Amino acid sequence: MITLTPGHLTLPQLRQIARESVQLKLDPASFAKIDAGAKAVADIAAKGEPAYGINTGFGRLASTHIPHDQLELLQKNLVLSHAVGVGEPMARSSVRLLMALKLSSLGRGHSGIRREVMDALITLFNADVLPLIPVKGSVGASGDLAPLAHMSAVLLGVGEVFIRGERASALDGLRVAGLAPLTLQAKEGLALLNGTQASTALALDNMFAIEDLYRTALVAGALSVDAAAGSVKPFDARIHELRGHQGQIDAAASYRELLEGSPINQSHRDCDKVQDPYSLRCQPQVMGACLDQMRHAADVLLVEANAVSDNPLIFPDTGEVLSGGNFHAEPVAFAADNLALAASEIGALAERRIALLIDATLSGLPPFLVKDGGVNSGFMIAHVTAAALASENKTLAHPASVDSLPTSANQEDHVSMATFAARKLADIADNTKHILAIELLAAAQGVDLRAPYHTSPKLAPVMETIRSQVAHYELDHYFAPDIAVIAKLVGERAFAKVAPFSFASEQ
């Protein structure tokens, strides 16, 4: 059970919500603020004074006054008309994050929503009745309207859900959770719809996956150093301290620890080789830059996870209703775009190491890592697959945040495209996962070919894990299942756990 304290969510809590079947409860300390916000809205609605989002239309229709007896219909119509998403359902982990983030934002007491509505969301979450939310349809301003409308429609008994993973109607979902359809009061539909929770949830969910891939890449890169008989001297702490970038310093320390005591490395300490190619030698510089970007993105996304991104905002202490633009997800878009760059570079560097290993001139290993080359092609086309995936990532890494299209009759004339920026991270991460799987296989093959010498004590379990699933490549065979089984292990963090490094979300 995780206690949600609005405005004080942590990265470990968010990772746990996404990855584990934890339940939620709202911190009782937030109740007074929530109730005060709801009362402030009720008072404004009762007076009939024009206030955006409470008794007016929305967007370009903001100047249209809505009579008191139509306020409930206004909120219902808002939710139903905005539920226009398309595409595949959002991943379960992302929906769980979305709901938790929405509860945190509402729980700060500036949205004017009743606890009854929030309790219904928590009940659905804890019953594992999750809204079916199409993943496409948001431009990231005014908030993530379409995705959040699909979440909200379930509270009205409209739309679809997943009940413990099985697709069903919203009414069936409410029944399983012991709930009845709600009637939303003034502003409550808008409070549910307005916000950056979809883009932030997608960005966080994919960031956690990319963090795991980063750690796996450290392990794969270190194993490739041994496979290629590379030097550990470029990882000397003194080099990296002189430059001063913390990510680079930390990455170099990881490589030193992973390669400590490697018999392969000790076997060629006195060779006449002067310098390794950049894909080996400059790993701390490249991976360190990725790490710095990822840490910055995590900082930004944690702030956004705790933010109130509704509009308008209710200030119960003064009774004011202030319209602003906290729904504009530009910070999320930038963070997601930076994560895309980092994840793509992780894969790009791994692809270059695969290319190095299969090149006999550079690695000193048999061509394409197989004996009797010619009749056997070995890792030749596995590298082509890695190259295809790395190239695809370069296109996917194009920043989404530089794009904008005006919407709502030019009232909303600049948007963030944060949801797409966050969503495409999943494709980049999946490509990078498979590149790393191919590298792990290639590096393990190279280490085998260095016999009688072995890799380091830290990397020995990695070799054991790989060889427990995939045998040494002796002769050409149907290769795709080998890649698939190692990619599955990458996704399960089997190799990430070996890295002597952790992110803030894992602490």
Curated annotation (Swiss-Prot):
Enzyme class: lyase
Gene Ontology BP terms: L-histidine catabolic process to glutamate and formamide; L-histidine catabolic process to glutamate and formate
Catalytic activity: L-histidine = trans-urocanate + NH4(+)
Pathway connected to this protein: Amino-acid degradation; L-histidine degradation into L-glutamate; N-formimidoyl-L-glutamate from L-histidine: step 1/3
Record key words, sorted: Cytoplasm, Histidine metabolism, Lyase
EC number from the UniProt entry: 4.3.1.3
Pfam families per UniProt: Lyase_aromatic
Modified residues (2,3-didehydroalanine (Ser)): S142
Main localization of the protein described in the UniProt heading: cytoplasm
Location in chain, cross-link 5-imidazolinone (Ala-Gly): A141-G143
Family the entry assigns: Belongs to the PAL/histidase family.
NCBIfam families: hutH, PRK09367.1
Full protein name: Histidine ammonia-lyase
